[in-house]
Amino acid sequence: MAVSVFDLFKIGIGPSSSHTVGPMRAAARFVSRWLDEKGVLTRVARVRGELFGSLAHTGRGHGTDKAVLCGFEGEWPDKIDPDTIPGRLERIRASKNIRLLGRHEIAFDEKSDLIFNKRTKLPYHSNGMRFTAYDTAGNELATRDYYSVGGGFVVNHDEAAEDRIVADTTALPHPFHTGDQLLKACDESGKSIAQVMFENEKAWRSESEIRSGLLTIWKAMQDCVARGMRETGVLPGGLKVQRRAPAMVKDLCDRPEASLKDPLTILDWVNLYALAVNEENAAGGRVVTAPTNGAAGIIPAVLHYYHRFVPGATEQGVLDFLLTAAAIGILYKENASISGAEVGCQGEVGVACSMAAGGLTAALGGSIYQVENAAEIGMEHNLGLTCDPIGGLVQIPCIERNAMGAVKAINAQRMAMRGDGKHRVSLDKVIKTMRDTGRDMQDKYKETSRGGLAVNVIEC
């Protein structure tokens, strides 16, 4: 299995990579591949979607219903304009009609054609969904099961049954599947982790395309932070959460002299960057999965810290950061999970913290062993972290948790670079521990809003 840096860092929309980005991609894939390409689109009289497991329990708060409707109309998360979504949904719901792929209009009653099945779970993952199309006589034209396995990744029933994430067998110059293999590849080639990743990426793209693509990801992160610092108001949903980033940036800019008295003011900026991204995500804005939407603020916040506050920061440093972070993310993707519905928030915020810690260490010139150490520290102290969003919304505790994860990543980098890279717990061991902990964790702590803060804090 070969995973690209651009599989992990994908431009999409909020609030959730597993509950918004993934379902939109799945619905769009169903109508394009199984209706249009099979030549049956014009015969479709009814389309039905059914959501299972975590998608059923927290899907409304995560915008899964909206994502599926947009996907049925042929929209993709990296292309859709978030500002057009409210009008599109209003049209579908008012007319009780939907335009499959934007051109074949059929009747669609959301109450009967999009079911949140909270009693059933599909066999291979908590984030399961089933799409079925019928003709005018009620005969089934096509049906497919899909699983949104975290980070916007989607697999169908057959892929899930074979325990495959992506059917890509591209031969890479430096293949690795574990942290030890990654370090060995670096040792044998004399290359850094970022250089190994860059060489692997060349199996798919030219050098200029890789650089351009990574800088596009970085620009999207910067744009998201800028929007988050600018937009005001209350976030959607019943919690009535007020955006904090605009007031925070105003306070920091209006009182610059305060930073001279407080040596930790830089952390205020790191917090700000993370809050800005995750408030945008909660509002359904454009974000980068890093590696998920729920943890989308950590890597941009730490990368902004590097870009703004580290003397001598360079564009190459940004590229090294992203490539190194992606290599670490691949290890979690292949050997554990980046889905809160599968292993809790340790698989989202924990993984993002680990990726950011390793990426920052690389950008600051750390050795491959210090990078591995920083990544290990970043996860070790997030083990057991639950996913218990209040009201099923990606707001509390998710937004603040990203700020905490970003600060923790910077601290992990500092601890690792004060050492020589030698440590007792390897990254591979902590990844296995995270996977095992996630398997042992009760489902009520895995993005179902049936445990933890979700039941102890009343939604008002």
Segments and roles (model prediction):
Residues 8, 12, 270-278, 321-329, ...:
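Short alpha-helical scaffolding segments that buttress acidic/His motifs in well-ordered protein cores
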Residues 44-59, 91-98, 321-334, 376-389, ...:
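Short, mixed-charge aromatic SLiMs
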Residues 205-344, 452-460:
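Accessory "access/gating" subregions that flank catalytic or transport cores
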Residues 9-27, 283-302, 343-354:
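Conserved phosphate/anionic-ligand binding catalytic regions in large, soluble enzymes, centered on
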Residues 77-258:
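C-terminal regulatory domains involved in ligand/effector binding and gene-expression control
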Residues 313, 324, 330-403, 415-424:
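Hydrophobic alpha-helical bundle architecture
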Residues 424-460:
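Extended hydrophobic packing segments that form well-structured cores
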Residues 18-35, 300-312, 357-365:
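Alpha-helical support elements that line or immediately flank enzyme active sites
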